[in-house]
From Swiss-Prot:
It catalyses: N(6)-[(R)-lipoyl]-L-lysyl-[glycine-cleavage complex H protein] + glycine + H(+) = N(6)-[(R)-S(8)-aminomethyldihydrolipoyl]-L-lysyl-[glycine-cleavage complex H protein] + CO2. The lineage of its organism: Bacteria, Pseudomonadati, Pseudomonadota, Gammaproteobacteria, Alteromonadales. The gene is gcvP. Gene3D superfamilies: Aspartate Aminotransferase, domain 1, Type I PLP-dependent aspartate aminotransferase-like (Major domain). One of its GO terms (molecular function) is glycine binding. This is Glycine dehydrogenase (decarboxylating). It comes from Shewanella sp. (strain ANA-3). The modification N6-(pyridoxal phosphate)lysine is found at K709. It is an enzyme of class 1 (oxidoreductase). The keyword Cytoplasm does not apply.
């Protein structure tokens, strides 16, 4: 028996060995194949010596899963979860357990990617379509998006849309009613400054006194008042003002819709439809507009089309509006949204149905009526005389009330003007009302909830005026009326899940997306009530666990990036880009150089880069790339010199979007710095840097980090994401602040970029666990294994497909690009054909046509085993053999397994299949691996053009699914 030390038996590196796909013997086999002696040797061959770190990370040692869970459990226990009545867009909710277990905690839902391959994403596309239907029904408008990041950023998007579509072309003022949530106004002001818009804040009725392109109103407002805006909206629209409304999704169940009042755009948070507060997120925002504004909508929209068999099929509609195509001309930089949370909200609506939602909303309103009636009976004065769930109280001894509230472990809202706010929610019960009476009035008030309820039933309630009571039906589609039993709901969720391919089935090799393992142990703390049920505006001394977690995570990210400070607030990668560029903008302004507004961006950049630069008020100048995919230094020098006086920054990705470590990266940074600019290094490819090099060491000034790529937060089928930024010391004073919660930085007075001070804080435990469990050595080894896997795949495939770009020593970084243009020229087979054929082999396609048209970009990540890599390689080799048959004329160019892919059960059941020049087995069982574990696409190839020409973005008849 081999003698082992106690340290070896304790297996502190067990998580590392389970996170990394290839075991030690597989790694050595792969190293031998690619021609390297060790991971360190391979690293030395790939990463330029000039940027290689000489010191190890100082994160600490790796630890076991049980140890990590115990540590983070200790942090969770430091959070005091008081009963929250703060409101302001964040409310307690009861997540149906059938949704919690089968969606939120299910890798079939949380590990999928954005549905760019709709044929293998019909399940979540249907769930998202349901979300759009809920949004349209409740707002009374025509077309909904497939979620935005939060209510405040949706408000900023609404302002931008208003400017795009308003006929008041000379107007430059956006009006914001003075009773909107303060965090919303904060984010709107930040965005308006970049666009050069003037924001005027005042009482709602004063909007007509200004020459506006748009206006924003809150329904109900932050004090709880609900107002019929019908006449005001008509007057504004007559003046070509685009009317936007921030609305409460639960209140809309009972209230007259903003669309019925004449609103053009309605948005808000869907959080209270079964999504925990999570100390600020993640939550999905809904965004709905009139049909006439559809081409100006931000974000993804799911639409109905048809497949090649003529069957209804779903896919993302009108993608030509979006950043990955339109770049700086896009409507928005929105990319990763909040699809997992939108799906949870849509399932919440499906599970409760219209009657269940009305019961919940009516109960909330009734409890608010009872609370108001009891207080008024005791002579307490209210600010508002109408309400759905919120009352605002004046004339109280604020200090005494606050002391009693804290003693009772509840949080009320205390405004600076002495007003005390109370917002009720789905979790409110009778004893809560009794406790509120005790806190607000003191003991011995003598009020009885049952008696007050009887009084309201007898006399009727006027809290919602008759003119504001919803008269039209909602959620009449059968989907919202047939799954109210848990058995049916469980099966509906499973039926949709089975239509989608996620990481729990096979690898997803999307280049630039880093679809690595989202380990179960990392996910577990997210559901804990100590993290899930915290209000983002609670007193910070109640959130000591969150505070310590954020501080530790931030310090680790500082160490990993080589920067001096981190701002956690941005709640997506695109939002991080925007936040980083804002820091650069404010830095230049502080130096009296506000004229510096030109952003240099290489041709190969992600589409979000130019879109974000445009949002930050910058002018984009594109720099060329050479034939090897590197930044053309001579072109960069010329353009930097040409615009030197106005140069703000460069945005560059490293390793490059071509999948190589550019040797000249430090020279690129120096060129920009010499001309007074800053270097923004896009963190999309950070998975190839951690432990080997860093943006700060390279010479960059600011980066965003995709925690949903490099640091293991799952993609959720299109969100959530987190995009914190790291900055050098000179930019630290200019990162995002927050008007409600002061993070305690020099930047407190800066505007916010997200609604919550720490963004989607509820998912930060995932990245914390990832880093804690791996430790310094594990993080580095993960990066090195990602390089090994990519080079193994590249070398294997290079025998069958040309590899477009390689770096030093004929190596790639963490991803490789195969060039399919010669194949297309020789055979007519396109990258789309190959992508769809991969579905038949049980794989999601790699990234198509980015950064070069006619290519596939493959990123295997460190989490995939050699067995899975070989299965993917075998599929690609088999597909190349199929292409050869087309090239040889054995199969017609318009009738072969690639052209007809993907294949469905309907295909092989069709007698007409006999006329095809290939067998049913070739169609659906093209490999031995598929025969033992088959994934069935449920639709054939989808006609995108038909869908956009016949735009339909609502629930379709159930008969279309039968």
């Amino acid at each position: 028996m081999t003698k082992q030390t106690l340290t070896q038996l304790e297996q502190h590196d067990l998580f590392l060995r389970r996170h990394i796909g290839p075991d030690s013997s597989q790694q050595q086999e792969m190293l031998n194949y690619v021609g390297a002696e060790s991971l360190d040797d391979l690293t030395a061959q790939i990463v330029p010596e000039s940027i290689r770190l000489s010191q190890e990370l100082s994160i600490g040692d790796s630890c076991g899963e049980a140890e990590g869970i115990a540590y983070i459990r200790g942090l969770a226990k430091q959070n005091q979860v008081f009963k929250s009545y703060i409101g302001m867009g964040y409310y307690g909710t009861q997540v149906p357990n059938v949704i919690l277990r089968n969606v939120f905690e299910n890798p079939g839902w949380y590990t999928a990617y954005t549905p760019y391959q709709p044929e293998i994403a019909q399940g979540r596309l249907e769930a998202i379509l349901n979300f759009q239907q809920v949004s349209m029904d409740l707002t009374g408008l025509d077309l909904a998006s497939a979620s935005l990041l939060d209510e405040a950023t949706a408000a900023a998007e609404a302002m931008a849309l208003a400017k795009r579509v308003s006929k008041a072309k000379k107007a430059n003022i956006f009006f914001v009613a003075d009773d909107v949530f303060p965090q919303t106004l904060d984010v709107v002001k930040t965005r308006a400054e970049c666009f050069g818009f003037e924001v005027v804040v005042g009482p709602a009725h004063e909007a007509v006194n200004h020459e506006l392109f748009g206006a924003l109103f809150q329904y109900s407002n932050r004090f709880g008042q609900i107002t019929d805006f019908t006449d005001l909206f008509a007057e504004l629209r007559a003046k070509n003002v685009i009317v936007t409304v921030a609305a409460d999704i639960m209140a809309l169940v009972l209230l007259k819709s903003p669309g019925a009042m004449g609103a053009d755009v309605v948005f808000g948070s869907a959080q209270r439809f079964g999504v925990p507060m999570g100390f600020g997120g993640p939550h999905a925002a809904f965004f709905v507009a009139r049909d006439e504004h559809k081409r100006s909508m931000p974000g993804r929209i799911i639409g109905v089309s048809k497949d090649t068999r003529g069957n209804r099929a779903l896919r993302m509609a009108m993608q030509t509006r979006e950043q990955h195509i339109r770049r700086e001309k896009a409507n928005s930089n929105i990319c990763t949204a909040q699809i997992l949370l939108a799906n949870m909200a849509s399932f919440y609506a499906v599970f409760h149905g219209p009657q269940g939602l009305k019961t919940i909303a009516s109960r909330i309103n009734r409890f608010t009526d009872i609370l108001a009636a009891g207080l008024q009976a005791k002579g307490v004065s209210l600010v508002n005389n109408t309400w759905f769930d919120t009352i605002s109280i004046k004339g109280l001894d604020v200090a005494a009330v606050n002391a009693r509230a804290l003693a009772a472990e509840m949080n009320l809202r205390f405004d600076a003007d002495g007003i005390v706010g109370v917002s009720l929610d789905e979790t409110t019960i009778r004893t809560d009302i009794e406790a509120l009476f005790d806190v607000i009035l003191g003991a011995g008030h003598g009020l009885d909830v049952a008696a007050l309820d009887a009084q309201i039933v007898a006399q009727g309630s006027q809290s919602i005026p008759a003119s504001l009571v919803r008269q039209d039906a909602i959620l009449s589609h059968p989907t919202f009326n047939r799954y109210q039993s848990e058995t049916e709901m469980m099966r509906y969720i499973k039926r949709l899940e089975s239509k989608d391919l996620a990481l729990n089935y096979s690898m997803i090799s999307l280049g630039s997306c880093t679809m690595k393992l989202n380990a179960a142990v990392e996910m577990i703390p997210v559901s804990w009530p100590e993290f899930a049920n915290m209000h983002p505006f609670c007193p910070l001394d109640q959130a000591k666990g969150y505070t310590q977690l954020i501080e530790e995570l931030s310090s680790w990210l500082v160490n990993v990036t080589g920067y001096d400070a981190v701002c956690i607030q941005p709640n997506s990668g695109a939002q991080g880009e925007y936040a980083g560029l804002l820091a650069i903008r404010k830095y230049h302004e502080s130096r009296g150089e506000a004229h510096r507004n030109i952003c240099l961006i290489p041709q190969s950049a992600h589409g979000t880069n130019p879109a974000s630069a445009q949002l930050a008020g910058m002018q984009v100048v594109v720099t060329a790339c050479d034939k090897q995919g590197n930044v053309d230094l001579e072109d960069l020098k010329a353009k930097a010199a040409e615009v030197a006086e106005n140069l703000s920054c460069i945005m560059i990705t490293y390793p490059s979007t071509h999948g190589v470590y550019e040797e000249s990266i430090r020279e690129i940074c120096n060129i920009v710095h010499q001309h007074g600019g800053q270097v923004y290094l896009d963190g999309a490819n950070m998975n190839a840097q951690v432990g080997l090099t860093s943006p700060g060491f390279i010479g960059a000034d600011v980066s965003h980090l995709n925690l949903h790529k490099t640091f293991a937060i799952p993609h959720g089928g299109g969100g959530p994401g987190m995009g914190p930024i790291g900055v050098k010391a000179h930019l630290a004073p200019f990162v995002a602040g927050h008007v409600v919660v002061k993070p305690g930085r020099e930047s407190d007075n800066n505007g916010a970029v997200s609604a919550a001070p720490y963004g989607s804080a509820g998912i930060l435990p995932i990245s914390w666990m990832y880093i804690k469990l791996l430790g310094s050595n594990g993080l580095k080894k993960s990066t090195q294994t990602a390089l090994l896997n990519a080079n193994y795949v590249m070398k294997k495939l290079s025998e069958h497909y040309p590899v477009l770009f390689r770096g030093r020593n004929d190596r790639v970084a963490h991803e490789c690009i195969i060039d399919l243009r010669p194949i297309k020229e020789a055979s007519g087979v396109t990258e789309m054909d190959i992508a769809k054929r991969l579905n038949d082999y049980g794989f999601h396609a790699p990234t198509m046509s980015f950064p070069v048209a006619g290519t596939l970009m493959i990123e295997p990540t460190e989490s995939e085993s050699k067995v899975e890599l070989d299965r993917f390689i075998d599929a690609m080799v088999s597909i190349r053999a199929e292409i050869a048959k087309v090239e040889a004329g054995e199969w017609p160019a318009d009738n072969n397994p690639l052209h007809n892919a993907p294949h469905t059960m309907a295909d092989i059941m069709d007698p007409a299949f006999d006329s095809r020049p290939y067998s049913r087995e070739v169609a659906v069982f093209p490999s031995a691996a598929v025969r033992t574990n088959k994934f069935w696409p449920t639709v054939n190839r989808i006609d995108d053009v038909y869908g956009d020409r016949n735009l339909f973005c609502a629930c379709v008849p159930l008969s279309d699914y039968e």
